[in-house]
């Protein structure tokens, strides 16, 4: 059905009624006490991976839901036409209507032989051509066949990009560090703050450094400024501009700007305008990943995501893991009033995973206007944040356990560690904390339990835990290229489903434009003499302080 505001859908109103009569009164420990099979009812296993990579368990049982809750939320998804929008996406329709573009990143990881068409054209031959180019290049660099201008093999790779051209490659190369080539050192430069580039270059030798300049348009201000400074640093040693060709490659679609920079068109890795930045790690933007972990592992990374795509498209909503996770998230944000969502990976290699998911979720669904142009009257775009466990337990978990805010959480851990130190003792301790935290959040601790420990009466309230705090538990067999690909795709489809229900366009990002435009005006003023007076008094004061100093 066609609709503007999700809140006008009959199913939304049914969920609201259910929340008032049932949802807000649910007590998790009572639900578990009444139903010994609750874990089985609300846990789902993703079996789409090879034996060495999977399966992945998703346990939703520690959520403030009943079977009726799920039924009503699924009806909401159906009324909001989640399945129809999903099918339109995979059909190559221009569902990013504000930019008149298809949303076709699943084609980048389509490891099947099936064609995928946009505007009547099968895009797969072009996708495979770029992948072959990535394979040839990464194989040459990793083997030492690709030489720098003095004949030495590459030892350092510097990826220069920002946003999706940085967050994805950073996160994936960190997450898959056990698969990385030890004689290759990776650096990522994103911030326009000169410190970021300077610190990376301190560790590099111009003769053995390869720069990947990652910018779709090759006009992004931060990336182009960093790239020019990197080239200046390189030429200070190499002297001859022709040597740039051996040390700089471009991940871009703008051949004119790329060649003007001095990069050979043969060393340009293309991707299409239907690839959004936050979905671009699967594209040529993932070249740093392929260079570091090897093309075969990069291909496994793609295949894991493809397996989740196939699952999302073929599984009924009632049992569809990403769809259910999204609907439960909507249940908290729009009916319980939760504003944030915690992601706590109990795996040190995944320390950048929450930052990656921040962009995926918040840039996609940080919108207040529906697809039909109306202002929403409900909550969209949860604030997603997190840090790895167990570090996070010693910082912000206090607020989650005893604070005033409801903070739904995802806890993520692999069963197998890449580093089973001390006969796996470290990992057993890690898992014990993982399991205990979800249990503690659910159970809490009553005043009677605190008092029974001999706590003085006046201290009892301070040691009481309300409990009834919801969480999802996600347990992978092991973090491998394929399982990581599947997990990222899972969160992509969670984000998609949320946006579909809220009826917003999850695929543009006009919110990042205004500040960039104003920054150009401010920069021009910083490069002229005299005080500025054409802003508000605060902005004038800040600019003039920078120009004149204290």
Swiss-Prot record:
Residues at the active site: 363, 394, 516
Localization in the cell: Cytoplasm, Cytosol
Keywords: Cytoplasm, Gluconeogenesis, Glycolysis, Isomerase, Phosphoprotein
A GO molecular-function annotation: carbohydrate derivative binding
Binding-site residues, D-glucose 6-phosphate: 164-165, 215-220, 359, 363, 394, 516
CDD domains referenced in this protein's UniProt entry, alphabetically: SIS_PGI_1, SIS_PGI_2
InterPro entries documented for this protein: G6P_Isomerase, G6P_Isomerase_C, Phosphoglucose_isomerase_CS, SIS_dom_sf, SIS_PGI_1, SIS_PGI_2
Catalytic activity: alpha-D-glucose 6-phosphate = beta-D-fructose 6-phosphate
Principal location listed in the UniProt entry: cytoplasm
Keyword Isomerase recorded: yes
GO biological process: canonical glycolysis; gluconeogenesis; glucose 6-phosphate metabolic process; glycolytic process
Coiled coil: none
Phosphothreonine PTM sites in chain numbering: 455
Top-level taxon in the UniProt lineage: Eukaryota
Quaternary structure, from the entry: Homodimer.
Family from the record: Belongs to the GPI family.
Function, in words: In the cytoplasm, catalyzes the conversion of glucose-6-phosphate to fructose-6-phosphate, the second step in glycolysis, and the reverse reaction during gluconeogenesis.
Protein's name according to its UniProt entry: Glucose-6-phosphate isomerase
Organism encoding this protein: Schizosaccharomyces pombe (strain 972 / ATCC 24843)
